[in-house]
Regions:
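Alpha/beta enzyme core
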Residues: 2-18, 26-43, 55-188
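Conserved, carboxylate-rich catalytic/transport cores that coordinate ions
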Residues: 23
């Protein structure tokens, strides 16, 4: 109803964990059901895509692609850099042959999201972004710029007390990575 009301596209995002209790075929039909429901509400051409979030193996991504997903995220950020490049490139080649878009990941975010967790973060190196995007051909890229996954974004010792409000304030975020990438790789993402 919301996509019809605001006339906006919808992304139905599925975690790897959701695949454990709802197989890819069921998820595909749920997405198709959402399209049909939007049509019943009067949306002539609903733009609804089905996206896998944090797929960590080629096999998981391939299964989703074969089941009709519109896009997949291959998260090889837990791997050494060259292995992440190789895995992402393999997924991209398979996905693009099936008209499916691919999101890669570079750098490690602290926190917990779905089954992905880390106690530390590794900021993404701008030079690696350029190399990674060029070598893998990924359509979009999740990078680590100081943000974190999950409900607990910062520990108390990372925050400062605002003297005016008495509330804890998280540290400022630095987006130098984005500026460097934009300067060296025009048009990406």
């Amino acid at each position: 109803e919301a996509c019809q009301e605001v006339k906006a596209p919808v992304i139905l995002q599925v975690s790897k964990g959701a695949r454990q209790y709802a197989n890819a075929t069921l998820l595909r039909y749920m997405a198709q059901g959402a399209v049909e429901y939007a049509k019943e509400l009067g949306c002539e051409n609903p733009q609804i895509v089905l996206h896998l979030d944090h797929g960590d193996t080629f096999e998981t991504c391939k299964s989703c692609i074969d089941s009709g997903f519109s896009s997949v995220m291959i998260d090889g950020s837990h791997l050494p850099y060259e292995e992440n490049v190789a895995l992402t490139k393999k997924v991209v080649e398979y996905a693009h042959a099936h008209d499916v878009t691919v999101e890669g990941e570079l750098g490690v975010l602290a926190g917990v999201e779905d089954e992905v967790s880390s106690d530390h973060h590794t900021y993404t190196n701008p030079e690696e972004v350029i190399d990674f995007a060029t070598r893998t051909g990924c359509d979009s890229l999740a990078i680590s710029i100081g943000t974190s996954h999950g409900a607990y974004k910062f520990t108390p010792e990372q925050c400062t007390l605002d003297p005016q409000t008495g509330k804890m304030v998280p540290p400022p975020l630095a987006f130098y990575v984005l500026k460097a990438v934009e300067e060296k790789l025009p048009g990406f993402p």
